[in-house]
């Protein structure tokens, strides 16, 4: 799936809407543009992956929407985290962290994440930044998240991480299987 907008062709699972008013509204920060249209169309053939076989488009309707996005912010309190992680039926959280995957070092925060992971809630770490990636082993706080059962979202967009989780959960994968598959590219959504 691609997005063609304002003369640019971009991978849908690598693209984020950045502006609600301008024509140049979509950006693909962590993956090159596939083509640019002007007088001539300039294709970025190296980045265009062709399967080699023609197949009929098969939409996937089995999505489990018991997924939330939790954006961290300075001063976030335990009751907020506990309320979100305690949502009835919650199966996965996309945790938007600072920079390359950093989060509060507070004991209660790590404890809440550990308890949620132990209950089978999949927690995926993505950066709040427009570009770049999560590197959980780079800093102590990221390493603590790993110890709490949080998995890296690498350079995934928030939108792509949510969709991937909904797809995997909707197809009946267990929490451990989902955690494992979040570390693999299914459709070019992350760079490994």
What is each PLM-predicted segment?
Residues 1-3, 176:
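Core catalytic loop region at the nicotinamide-binding pocket of NAD(P)H-dependent oxidoreductases
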Residues 2, 11-100, 105, 185-192:
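Accessory alpha-helical/coil subdomains and C-terminal extensions
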Residues 8, 74, 130:
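Short, glycine/serine-rich, charged loops/turns that create anion-binding
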Residues 97-192:
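C-terminal non-catalytic interaction/assembly regions of soluble proteins
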